[in-house]
Amino acid sequence: MSGTGFRYGLNVMKKKKPNESSNRITFTEDDSSSSEQEHAPIPNSFSSQITAASDASKDDNYDASIYGFDEFYDSMKSAEREQMELKRLESKDRRPKYMENLIESAKKRKRDLLLARERALLKKNELEGDDATEKFVTSSYKKHREEVQKAIEDRKEEDEKSITDTTTGMKDFYASMLDRQEKIHQAAVEGVQNSKKTGAEIGDAMKGQDTLGSDNLILEAKKKGLKLELNDNNEIVDQRQILTAGLNIRKSSANNSMRDDKKRNHKSSYKRSLSPSTRYHQDRPDKRHGTYSLEEIDKQRKEFENRQRLQKEKEFQKSREAALKIHASRNTTETQVQSARERYLQRKKKAATNP
C-alpha cells in the first residue's frame, strides 16, 4: 500500500514549487534597451495572440456614447419641453370652439330684427303718406336707411340663390343616378361599336390577305396591338369580338353542315316511305312539354271519363256473367236431383203395385 502512493483519508495534493528560473534575476545584453521593451508582455502561445487581437478589435469598435445617459436624458427632456412650449403657445391663441359661430348667429339675428323693424316702419310711413316720411329725418338716419335697404336687397339675393342652389330631394337624386347610368350605358355601347368596327376591319384584312398564313396574320395583328386567336373551327377571331351582345353561338363548320343535310334528306325520305296516317301522327306537335288551351283540357278530361266509365262497365259485365254461370250450374244440379228423385218414386210405386 505504501508503494502505490495512496493513504487513508484525504489525498492532499502537493503544491508545485514555483519556477526558480522565473524568479532569478539575470543580466543580458538587452539591459540597455528602453523600459517599454522591458515591460512589454511576451505572448507565450498562439491563443494568447488571438485574444490580444480580439481585445484590440473590441477597443476599436467601442462606442463611447453608449454610456452617455445624461446627454440622452437632457435631449429627451428638451424635446418634451419644446412640445410643452408649443402647446402653451397654441392654447394662448386658442379660442372657444363654438363661440365664433354663436357670435355670428347673434349678429345675424340682430340684423334680421333690425330689418324687420325697418320694414314695419316703411309700411307704416306708406300708410301715413309722403309727408310723414320727411318728419324728423336727419342725414345719419338717411344713411342708416340706405344701409338697411342695401342689406334687404342682399338678403333677397341670398334667398334667391339659396332657392336655386338647393336640391329638390329625391328627384335630383334619381335624376343624377339616371344620368350616371345613361353615361355608363352610352360608354358600353360605344365600346361595343368600336369592337365591331375593329372586328370588321380585321375581317376585311383577312380576306385581302388569304395568301398569308394564319400565324403570320396573328403576328401582324399583335404588332398592331390587336389580340387575335384561333377558335375551334380554325378561324381567326378577335378576343373582344368573342363575347358580343346576344347569344355567343359558334358558327358550324362545313363538315357539320354537310352532316346536317344528310340527316335531313334521310329523314325526309323515311317520312315519304310511311303511310299517310303514320306520317300525320308523327308530324303532330308534341305537347307533352307545351301549353294546352281550355278546350283541349276539357276534351281530354271527357275522354278520360269515358274510358273510365267503359272500363267499369266491362268489369261489371264480366262479374255479372261469372255470377250467372255459377247460378245456372247450381239450378241444373237441382233439377237433375229432382228428376232422379221422381224416377225413383215411380219405380218404387211400380214395384209396390206389382209384387
Curated annotation (Swiss-Prot):
Region annotation (Disordered) ranges: 1-57, 253-292, 325-355
Keyword annotations: Coiled coil
Bias (Basic residues): 346-355
Coiled-coil regions listed in the entry: 99-162, 293-326
The keyword Ribonucleoprotein is assigned to this record: no
Protein name (record): Nuclear speckle splicing regulatory protein 1 homolog
Keyword Ion transport in annotation: no
Bias-annotated ranges (Basic and acidic residues): 280-289
Feature: compositional bias, Polar residues: 44-54, 329-339
Entry similarity comment: Belongs to the NSRP1 family.
A GO CC annotation given for this chain: ribonucleoprotein complex
GO molecular function: mRNA binding
Transmembrane segments: none
Annotated GO biological process: regulation of alternative mRNA splicing, via spliceosome
One of the Pfam families matching this protein, by short name: NSRP1_N
InterPro entries attached to this UniProt entry: NS_splicing_regulatory_protein, NSRP1_N
